[in-house]
């Protein structure tokens, strides 16, 4: 066995966000400084994974709720955009690079997860092609900078899970969600609307197209706030809203349901909603972003 440390490069730096550490630091600081920390300490957050020019300010609302003094392990659940995956996959590297500083994968937790037989390994190529986890790394590094040598990350690529698989993974992750020193980051954008996304749901009673999109998204967000995985599945079946992180969200909701059965009291609130642009005609397109936090009472 070689002890060579394997790194995942920050493959989207320089395109989806700046590759300059000082510049990135200043941007993140700027966004975070404009936001209140009303839901600290968050046990889980939902935040977007688009280019920072589009969603950086929205994501700040979620990351501001992270308390670095209690957080020791950060589970990052992101959807798979490029490879077909029916389960969940773990990374095959030790270190995730960011322009700020390197993040260490928790090999102990990875070992526990791997032993369940429920996971596969993603190749380095798949890992570096995927942006859904990477877009959370600079924000994670920034939120945790005051304790940067004291935490690890657990990246999990989430496949197109069936409802029963979402339940199984929810049950598995619930014991980790129960621990106050763990934070779950769930990576998801909301509605992808327009011809290029092959999705054009429009409820005329809402007025302009972008208002209809907002109404549709907020319907889904309010179901997530009710912490009800079954209603969330039914909403997706009915409206087919193109929420790319629907499976990571489903896993989180099922983990919460498991803990509620054991008497844990939690609440989830969305803190910000944004759209990349306002659609007014059938030629337009937009992506929606939402940021929220789960707190334990």
UniProtKB/Swiss-Prot annotation:
Family from the record: Belongs to the MEMO1 family.
Gene3D superfamilies from the UniProt entry: LigB-like (3.40.830.10)
Source taxon at top rank: Eukaryota
Protein name stated in the entry: Protein MEMO1
Molecular function as annotated in GO: peptide binding
GO BP of this protein: regulation of microtubule-based process
UniProt keyword annotations, A-Z: Phosphoprotein
Pfam family, one: Memo
The protein's assembly and partners: Interacts with ERBB2 phosphorylated on 'Tyr-1249'.
NCBIfam families: AmmeMemoSam_B (TIGR04336)
Entry-annotated residues carrying Phosphotyrosine: 210
Job of this protein: May control cell migration by relaying extracellular chemotactic signals to the microtubule cytoskeleton. Mediator of ERBB2 signaling. The MEMO1-RHOA-DIAPH1 signaling pathway plays an important role in ERBB2-dependent stabilization of microtubules at the cell cortex. It controls the localization of APC and CLASP2 to the cell membrane, via the regulation of GSK3B activity. In turn, membrane-bound APC allows the localization of the MACF1 to the cell membrane, which is required for microtubule capture and stabilization.
Lineage, uppermost ranks: Eukaryota, Metazoa, Chordata, Craniata, Vertebrata
